[in-house]
């Protein structure tokens, strides 16, 4: 069976920013089926329950399964880990970019919307993905290196550390992210 792909944006993001359009285009050019849900963002809207409701529509339609590859950025890695563990959904591969859990200190607005995504059983996600690849940077301006490394050390089957990558978003020059292509 053919793989399906999901790309999940981060806090206050959308499917139209950072490297999301680039990866989507690359998958589509290989005739892949790719979904880029536009999750609610902002204080009062961006929370685990709202994101869970939206992604559950895809799950209930049978679109998230053992042939699914999920790319996720920033707060989205912990969201998708939480989602897979809660729903006990097995997928093929997680490609997580700048993931973290239980980290506060970005600023009050980000901390408030991110906190609902966190959960205690992070290592359990290893039961629900055949591969977990974590990309992160040594100089992320939003999340401390130690928080991203701890996240990756807990779950990753492979880690890629980029020395000067910032938050691996468009502000850091990542409108294209060629290192992700090998995981399509």
Q: Model-predicted segments: where are they?
A:
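Active-site catalytic motif of lipid deacylating hydrolases and related acyltransferases
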Residues: 2-64
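Active-site nucleophile loop of the alpha/beta-hydrolase fold
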Residues: 10, 39-42, 95-105
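Catalytic histidine neighborhood in serine/cysteine hydrolases
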Residues: 32-35, 153-169
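Catalytic histidine-centered segment of alpha/beta-hydrolase-like enzymes
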Residues: 45-46, 165-177
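Conserved alpha/beta-hydrolase fold motif
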Residues: 69-71, 94
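Gly/Ala-rich beta-loop-alpha elbow adjacent to hydrolase catalytic centers
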Residues: 71-81
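Short beta-strand/loop motif that positions the catalytic acidic residue
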Residues: 128-129, 133-136, 140
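Conserved alpha/beta-hydrolase "acid-adjacent" motif
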Residues: 141-147
């Amino acid at each position: 069976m053919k793989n399906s792909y999901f790309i999940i944006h981060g806090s206050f993001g959308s499917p139209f920013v950072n490297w999301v359009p680039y990866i989507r285009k690359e998958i589509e050019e290989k005739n892949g089926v790719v979904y880029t849900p536009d999750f609610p963002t902002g204080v009062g809207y961006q929370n685990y329950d709202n994101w869970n409701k939206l992604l559950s529509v895809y799950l209930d339609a049978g679109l998230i399964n053992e042939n699914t590859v999920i790319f996720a950025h920033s707060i989205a890695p912990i969201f998708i880990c939480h989602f897979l563990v809660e729903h006990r959904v097995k997928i093929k591969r997680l490609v997580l970019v700048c993931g973290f859990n239980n980290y506060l200190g970005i600023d009050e607005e980000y901390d408030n919307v991110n906190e609902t995504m966190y959960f205690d059983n992070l290592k359990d996600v290893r039961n629900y993905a055949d591969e977990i690849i974590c990309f992160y940077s040594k100089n992320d301006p939003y999340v401390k290196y130690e928080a991203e490394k701890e996240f990756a050390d807990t779950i990753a089957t492979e880690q890629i550390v980029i020395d000067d990558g910032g938050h691996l978003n468009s502000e850091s020059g990542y409108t294209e992210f060629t290192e992700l292509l090998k995981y399509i």
